[in-house]
Design a protein with these regions (language model features):
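Function-determining surface determinants
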Residues: 1-136
Length: 136
């Protein structure tokens, strides 16, 4: 999935630039939260990549707005959980059919990791809303 292009036309100052970049990356991630509902490999992977882009943008600008660091740190935890779920998907795809107990364990772990990811995203949404209300 390609990143959404950030429209910087008419940007007059650093605050506007930061706002446009973060709004674009956040919109991209929010659009792909459907992966948390669908729970399929590709949708979760796309959501993870969008979260990574958002995190990198936050890290880039945290020198200007230190409160972004906490959100970036939480996004890293979300990425880790989604990455672990992806690892379970890969293991399940190569697991021999003669290992049903291992398959059940991996499926359970994956489901728990996706649930954790969903909870982390909900927490992140609250953090980002608080940041938005603080900035306006």
């Amino acid at each position: 999935m390609k990143p959404e292009r950030v429209d910087l036309r008419g940007v007059a100052n650093v605050d506007e630039l930061v706002g446009r970049v973060l709004q674009t990356r956040l919109r991209e991630a929010r659009t792909l939260t459907v992966g948390l509902e669908l729970r399929d490999k590709q949708s979760l992977h796309d959501f993870r990549i969008a979260c990574k882009r958002l995190r990198y943008a936050l890290e880039r600008f945290q020198v200007l707005e230190p409160s972004l660091e906490q959100i970036a740190d939480r996004l890293a935890l979300l990425q880790d959980a989604l990455g672990e779920a992806h690892d379970r998907d890969m293991l399940l795809s190569i697991l021999p059919p003669t290992m049903p107990a291992t398959e059940r364990r991996l499926q359970t772990e994956r489901a728990e990791l996706v649930e954790r990811s969903s909870a982390l995203w909900s927490e992140l949404e609250r953090m980002m809303q608080a940041l938005d209300s603080h900035r306006t």
